[in-house]
Amino acid sequence: MICIFQQSLLTIIFMEIIYTSHLEFRLRVRNIPYDLPREIFGQSKEHYYDNLTRHHIAIQKMEFEGKLRELALTYDRDENMIEMITIHPIKPHQKNSRISSGRWERI
């Protein structure tokens, strides 16, 4: 479960978090701490909708492999559930390209 605070309405929403098997595999392969996707989702001030994949993306700068990097968390959500799909480092030019092309829309 995750607690989401909506700043504008002072509303608290509890949502179930599901890690896909693909995300769990990526966490193991990339040596990423298990709770990092939850941290990214909860702390990120950058959330996008990907018009190509139809998934949501959360971007957060975190320490990864000894460096400060932006990590992209791909997820789907509905009224009471967040399904976290994958996580990976993203380079600034990749993020900027997806935003400027209109592929990613800020939400």
Q: What residue spans do the PLM features occupy?
A:
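Ribonuclease/tRNase effector modules and their secretory precursors
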Residues: 1-107
